[in-house]
Amino acid sequence: MTRALPLPLRCCAALLGAALPLASPAQTAAPAAGDAGWRQCAALAGDSQARLACFDRWAGEQAWQAPAASASAQPAAPGDAPPPPVDAAPPATHTAEAVQVDGCRDAQYGTLSRFWELEAGSDCGAFRFRGYRPMTVSVVGANNVNRQPTSGNPENNATSPIDYRRTEMRMQLSVRTKLAQGLLPRSNPGLRDSLWFGYTQQSYWQLFSPDISRPFRNTDHEPEIMYVYPTDARLPWGWRWRYSGLGLVHQSNGQSLPLSRSWNRVYLMSGMELADRWRITGRIWKRLHESAANDDNPGISNYVGRAELGVAWTPDPDNTLSLTARHSLGATARGSVRLEWLQSLGTSFVGRRTNLRLHTQLFSGYGDSLIDYNRRRTVFSVGVSLVDF
């Protein structure tokens, strides 16, 4: 009966059998002596010791040969070296460590496009809370303070003065959310119109007046709804017209007589920019009619103004300077001028700039608050603002 090969012999025979098909044509034409050698050893089935010794002798007689080079291969000249291979691996996907940037914070889009989400790529979706005007806490010093507010309506005249100080705190909260988008068809599907709701609250707090229990001197509430349409067009000298829109705004201080102040307006607005360094925005409005008996502040448009023009300059990512002017557009020229400087404060834990700004502001004119609509003031403030969150 034929005995099974020992394990070492079986492994050796298997390796030899696998190696034979890989031999080059030249090797397959080699003398049959090498081939006959292992065949003779395999034929010694009756004597395992002699068979193992035969395979050992045959293996010792073999010499390793490198695989033959292809006949078509030619030595390459030094100057003919092939270029390095192109990496055909697929691009790396975002990992958990990668910083994901929302469209409305993607710096490859302009400031106005990100602010109003004018393009599909700068969109952050509906019903997300975003900043509107700067959210500010600042210390304010003024050349005067309105201790006994008056109005063109006798019902709205304060009966006695209050000993307010000229130095106080100012706090502003301002948020908005997009209610809808894509309301009107456009020839360019990459542009988006949108409907927004915004709310701004500004308070003057007499923090440095302990003798009168540090009251809030005035708080203005300003809800508004606005529609923004991306009127994208190239203008002369490199300017780009970015948007137009309209809105409805209510502003009031929520107080009872005689300190109640309020008005309602409809407005048109527009904005353009130059290379994301310069921005010009404008609004013009019309006050909605109120009866004389219900008008808390007659002639407010002749003081606060009927139009607003803003110019902003961003010389570098850390600084923004802006100038905002309002004008009454009437026979008597009134209004206000506001000069602002916002400077970035620090970086976040992921290395990006934070949304905190050192906010310095100088205001001169009418309407710094509703209670001061008919009182001219010059106000200087320094504080910290949160923008574009």
What are the roles of these predicted feature ranges?
Residues 222, 339-341, 360, 377-389:
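Outer-membrane beta-barrel "beta-signal"
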Residues 57-61, 93-252:
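Transmembrane beta-barrel domains of Gram-negative outer membranes and organellar outer membranes
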Residues 167-173, 193, 217-223, 260-266, ...:
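Residues that define the transmembrane beta-barrel architecture of outer-membrane proteins
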Residues 180-195, 231-243, 258, 274-279, ...:
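Short loop/turn motifs that connect adjacent beta-strands in outer-membrane beta-barrel proteins
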Residues 26-69:
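Alpha-helical, heptad-rich or low-complexity scaffold/stalk segments
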Residues 141-145, 201-205, 229, 248-256, ...:
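Transmembrane beta-strands of outer-membrane beta-barrel pores
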Residues 195-199, 225, 244-248, 280-284, ...:
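Membrane-embedded beta-strand positions of outer-membrane beta-barrel proteins
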Residues 239, 247-332:
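Detector for outer-membrane/organellar transmembrane beta-barrel domains
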